Amino acid sequence: MAFAWCVRRSASKLASACGQARSISAVVNRPSLALNPSPLSPFVSRGFLYTMAVDKLSSEQTLHLVIDSELNSALQTDDPNLNEEMAPGSFPLKIRDKPGDQSVTLTAYYNDERIHVDVGMPYLGDDVIDVFGPNNDELSFPLVVTVIKKNGVSIEFTCQAYADYIDLTDLTVHDYQYQMGETDWPRFKNLDDNLKKAFHRYLATRLDANITKLLHKYMVSKIKREYLLWLKNVNKFVDG
């Protein structure tokens, strides 16, 4: 069962919960239940409380089974070679990734430039791609690459990162030395095509195709890790 299933089912779960609430309300307000009231409640019979207890036990057992299935599915699809590929010395950028955070920060140096990369989690809408399936290469991640010169001037690239390329969508120039602040005009889409190509090449020199591919694999793996963390927290709740 896939992660996407959980995302898509939120609306139906809400409708189901509302239906259960109406059913319980109908049972509680039946006149026959008032003939033999429970000492615990003037409105609910002992039989009703027993049925509710059995239903609760059954639902918890079912939830445990589903969570175990999801955990096994996520663990079986993890990439065993990823840690080696992303290890210092193999991957040129230093990664800062805290469990539970929805973004990853990477830093590196290129000649006299300091490169700072922020990668966010993708938006998982109704048509989300199954991250446990074979088509997760189609996922894209929001990416902001900041290149900082020694003189303090920097340029910030706003992008979408795919498995095999980076789509540059906008850029901003910062020059605090002369109190220019931010300059985000003209918009990237309005630039001359040759200038656009030059910026794409400039960015690709600092984040080449191999880095892009590994970064995409790492972020897909992070989605799975965060999902596993969420499942384990749900398990703790059920066990409590």
Curated annotation (Swiss-Prot):
Record carries keyword Acyltransferase: no
Entries under Gene3D superfamilies matching the protein: Mitochondrial glycoprotein (3.10.280.10)
Entry's localization field: Mitochondrion matrix
Claim: Signal is one of the keywords in the record: no
InterPro entries from the UniProt entry: MAM33, MAM33_sf
GO cellular component, one term: mitochondrial matrix
Keywords: Mitochondrion, Transit peptide
SUPFAM superfamilies: Mitochondrial glycoprotein MAM33-like (SSF54529)
Major site of localization recorded for this protein: mitochondrion
Name of a matching Pfam family: MAM33
Family, per entry: Belongs to the MAM33 family.
Designated name of the protein: Uncharacterized protein At2g39790, mitochondrial
